[in-house]
From Swiss-Prot:
HAMAP family for the chain: KdsB
Superkingdom in the source lineage: Bacteria
Location of the protein in the cell: Cytoplasm
EC number: 2.7.7.38
Entry-linked SUPFAM superfamilies: Nucleotide-diphospho-sugar transferases (SSF53448)
Coiled coil: none
Annotated protein name in UniProt: 3-deoxy-manno-octulosonate cytidylyltransferase
UniProt record similarity statement: Belongs to the KdsB family.
BP GO terms, sorted: CMP-keto-3-deoxy-D-manno-octulosonic acid biosynthetic process; lipopolysaccharide biosynthetic process
Its biological purpose: Activates KDO (a required 8-carbon sugar) for incorporation into bacterial lipopolysaccharide in Gram-negative bacteria.
Pathway: Nucleotide-sugar biosynthesis; CMP-3-deoxy-D-manno-octulosonate biosynthesis; CMP-3-deoxy-D-manno-octulosonate from 3-deoxy-D-manno-octulosonate and CTP: step 1/1; Bacterial outer membrane biogenesis; lipopolysaccharide biosynthesis
Amino acid sequence: MTAAFTVVIPARYGSSRFPGKPLKTIAGKPMVQLVWEQARKSSAERVVIATDDARIVEACRAFGAEVLLTRDDHNSGTDRLAEVATQLGLAANAIVVNVQGDEPLIPPAVIDQVAANLAKHPEAGMATLAEPIDDVAALFNPNIVKVSTDINGLALTFSRAPLPWARDALARSKDELPADVPYRRHIGIYAYRAGFLHDFVSWGPCWLENTESLEQLRALWNGVRIHVADALEAPPGGVDTPEDLERVRRLLEA
């Protein structure tokens, strides 16, 4: 049985790379609605959209979602979730799953999986998911975050760079994946306990987080363990660019 949890979908209008992204239409619906519909198919007790923009609030109310207006000065989606946890009055041990607002194809099964993994691993302050990288272009793509873990499935680091660097193999060729190196792509879904979210905000960003623009590095920087498992069902990839949007449109509008 999956532990009780709440899904929060952070949705920013003012993305520096792709402004207005949550309201871009796919198959006649705003993208954030598709994410919400997928989250509603999970075992979550509650699904809430969190945004700093009145246009997104209006759109979400139009399709029947619970939506909260948050401050517009948060450093990351996790900082925004901490405000939501306070607004909802969640207990410190309540599990919150952060489903990115640009993942319209997120499988409901992985939402349940990441919540269950956190519940099963009290040594971890966060849980997240990954999948194997089988394409050398993905290894060198900075929009695809790489994750390395220890023997217990706990994250060692996350990076946009091709880590670990296979020194000898990549010196010979960068046109094929090095053999016997288990490269993994991080899937941007997180589970946390509500109490941890408040700690996360109190620490503030660290230089490593700012350098890579990866909020999970703040947790590692402060000694928090992050559990990483291979996703039961890998999502086909989120929408980071207009090209990604067209790819998802082709999948859903075919």
